[in-house]
Structures are given as structure tokens and as C-alpha cells.
UniProtKB/Swiss-Prot annotation:
GO molecular function, one term: 4 iron, 4 sulfur cluster binding
UniProt keyword list: 4Fe-4S, Iron, Iron-sulfur, Metal-binding
Stored PANTHER family: NITRATE, FORMATE, IRON DEHYDROGENASE
GO cellular component, one term: membrane
Primary role: Component of the cytosolic Fe/S protein assembly machinery. Required for maturation of extramitochondrial Fe/S proteins. May play a role in the transfer of pre-assembled Fe/S clusters to target apoproteins.
Keyword Iron: yes
Protein name: Cytosolic Fe-S cluster assembly factor NAR1
InterPro entries noted in UniProt: Cytosolic_Fe-S_CAF, Fe_hydrogenase, Fe_hydrogenase_lsu_C
Highest classification ranks of the organism: Eukaryota, Fungi, Dikarya, Ascomycota, Saccharomycotina
Family statement: Belongs to the NARF family.
Amino acid sequence: MSAILSADDLNDFISPGVACIKPPAQNSDQKFNSLNENGEVEIQIDSEGNPLEISKIDGKQTNLSPAQISLADCLACSGCITSAEEVLVAQHSHEELIKALNEKVDNNSTKVFVASISHQSRASLATAYNLSIEEIDKLLINLFINQMGFKYIVGTSIGRKLSLINEAQNLIEKKESEFDGPVLSSICPGWVLYAEKTHPYVLPRMSTVKSPQQITGCLLKTLAAHELGVTRNDIYHLSIMPCFDKKLESARPEKYGEQNTSNDVDCVLTAKELVTLLEQHSDKFQLIPPQAHTITNSAIPVVDLYSKCAPRTWPLVQYSWSNDSGSASGGYGYNYLKMYQNHLIMKHPTKYQQEGFSIDYVKGRNTDLTEMRLMYGSEKLASSAIVNGFRNIQNLVRKLKPTVKPGSTTGKGNALVARRRARVAGGITKASSPAGSDESADASKCDYVEIMACPNGCINGGGQINPPEDVSEKDWLSASLEKYNSIPLLDLAAMENVDTVAEIMQWSCLFREEFGVSENRLLKTWFNEVEKPTDSASILLGARW
């Protein structure tokens, strides 16, 4: 191993910052008072431990309020790569959920609780409790509706299908205009934060289509509020997700829709945290209650339960917990290729026949890098890639870094690095493919890249339940993947489901018209290049991670 490369460099996990560099905010009144009334001041602690601001001119004392850092602050800060752990725990924890539930009872408030749960979280829970997907779904519905008092619980399938369809349609439009790829997915908040804070030059390539979590949140809050005759602010939306970074995504401020700027998700818990909640409050809540056998063996079809626990106007309720084809992160890369195939068949029926298409899989240097190529005979028509894990992401963004303009000077070290990379790249190509062939996976040359920060993608998210001591991580992951793949499928990419795709999109348009929700508000996100700190103190604090 090279002297400049240690084992620590191979770890995909990015530790949170131990110190926050964001200064406490002051409103204009506070600033005016401090500067103009008190003049020069000093901070002292009184006998009760409270901070005081004391004027050196007249001795006037002013109580200081505690500084608070929110998740939205973390999104706008470059002090650390990911969020401060304390912020996540404080604002998105099972304790906060229990606190909110108790406040509803104690204060007799009008707050209504609703929940959505991801495919990967269901698979993780089913694996941990050794149950089928249908059994775990029935028990989850019983837990949230009958025990915790939630009004609705839905799967994230409709939100994901809207995300998949819009992603594919946007790519097809770009493809036909001969765009300069690749487009990079943005449904992984860990990857998005990394790009915003460290590689802003890739932001123009990022897809602006929202993730299933956020689309589901907008639909669920809007429909629930309308049916119950309350405001969106009266709806408390809990989302069960496979990844802790989803907490940060839920806090990203809405840029579109002046009338609906409130968060679509109020609390994000992972499957791991849900288990912790159940362990700490086993006297009140049980996923596996004494009558569990009666619940799981009920003669009521699970599809009827999906309908019963969803808002009355929830779309395509029979498919609202269904799965999608492709990877266990949602299948974005695969669905783009298949939908583009369907587009070509419908647009050029005499030129393209379904039986002439195939998808070739080209492996990369490791199992977390795969390229998929849509072929018609021997002709490559489109391509996408799956890039999982921080190391593969780093390699991709290096390749996408803008080249140095002609005439500009570069340091000797940079030139040496460039030559070294070129040698390495050339060696890899020669070793993995015959001379002159195009068999080496290269995500940077694809139309689209499905990017997830976690190795193995969302099914292996940091919030998934850990394996028992006697089970290897590899076997546990395989078991979770098997559960995930057992979720009933509604394959949007299948030619026979083209009408279903049209139905989903038509319903989306009607929803936006009826409730005055713009297309951007429902479906589009945005990115922000985070400026790096320039003062030495902030740089020093931000570097300690």
C-alpha cells in the first residue's frame, strides 16, 4: 500500500463535523441594540449560570438567548461534509415523535399524524423479524393506525413512480436534443450535500427531479389536509427511510410555491430507530403484539388494508405499496433505458421492434459500479450507470471536473497527477477489454448516472437494521435484498404498462390543478453551491471531522 494511502482512506463513511462554524443569528433589533445602545459589551455568567451581555458604558445587562442550529442551517453551511449528529438527534428522533404524540393527547390539539414508509425499510424490518413483506406490512399498519393513533399510512410507491417517470421523460427530452451528458441523479441527499459543498462544478449536471420521500410528502399532506378539513400545518408527516441523510433532505427549504412552503416531511426515522422506539416503549407499542398471528393471517387482502389506511383520494391505491424494476435504490438507471426503448418503439414503429432490443451490463472495477447499455442489435442507443459508494463517486466527479483552459498554467504537481491518472486509466482499459473495444464501464460517458452514497445502494442504507452477531453482513444484505425483490411489482418500464404510466401522469396533472400546486413545487428540487469559509477560525473548526 502506498505511503500516502491509509486504510482510513478506504472507508466510505464520512464522519459528521465535531464543531459547527455557523455563527448564531441575530435579528436586526438585536444588532441595533448591541451596537448603538450598549456600545462595547462583554459576556458574563450570572449566579444561576445564565449568559448576560453587559455594557461597558452604563453596565446595562441583557439576557442572551441560546444559539440554535437547525437542519436548514446545516444545508447552507460548508463547515463539515455532513450534518452535526446532535442536530439530527434533536430534531428528527423517536423521542421527538413520542413528544409530539404526547402533546396531542395532553393539549387535545388538532394535529393529525400520517406516515409513509419506503420499500427498503419494509425489507429491512421483514428481514429482522423473519416475516414476509405482506406480514410486515399488516403489522406496520396495525402499529401506526391502531396503536399509535395515526390517521393514514402509505407506501412511497406513487411518489417513486412519479419520480421515475419524470426523471425518464426529462432524460428522453435531453437525449433527443443531443445534450452533453451525463445527467446525475439527486435522490440521495448524502451525495447532493457532498456535491454542493465540495464539487459545485457538477451541480449543472444534477437532475432536479425530487425524491420519492419529498413527492410522497407533498401528496400526503395536501390530500390529508383537504379530506380532514385542516391546514397542512396541522398534518404531522413521519417518513420511515433507509438512510439518516434523509433527515437533512426533509429540512431543505422549498423554493417553489409561495402558498405551500411548509416542510412536506416533519420527522424522518430509519428502520433502526423505529426498532429502538419499540424497545423503549414496549409497554405501549408492539410491532409483534400477542395477537400478531391473527393480524398476519387475517382473511382481509392486504390490498384492502392499503386502501383502508390511505386517504380516500390516494391514487392507484392497489399499487401504492408496489415495487419497481431495476436496482434496490429505485431502479432509476434501468427505468430510463426501458422507457426510452418504449419511446422509440412508439415513435418509430416501423424502425424498431421490441424483440430487437436488449440491455447489456458492463461491470466496473468493483460491484458498486455498473454500466447498462440499451442495444438494438449491435447499435448502442443509450446508456446509464449505477455508482454506489464514496470511492466510486470520487472517481466519477474527478472525471467530470472541467479541463484546464488552453494557455492556463498548472503546477508541476498537478501535471504529475494528471499524467499518473492517464497512465492508470490506460492500464485499466487495456487490462479489462480487448484493444479497440468499448467494454470498460465508464459512468462519465453515460447519458445518466444513478448515484447513491452507500455501498450497495439504498438497501444497505446506514439506517437499516444491523445483522445479529452470528450472521455476516453479506448474508444479511442478501436476505434483505431477497425481501425487497419479493415486493409485488408494477413494472413501469414494461410496454404493457404504458397506459398506467399515462394514468399516473394524468392524475398528477389533475392533482396540481385542483390544489393549486405547481409542477415545480411537487416535482422539482434545487441546489445551492455552498461557499467555503474564508476566516481562519472557521476553517480550523470545519476541518476537525
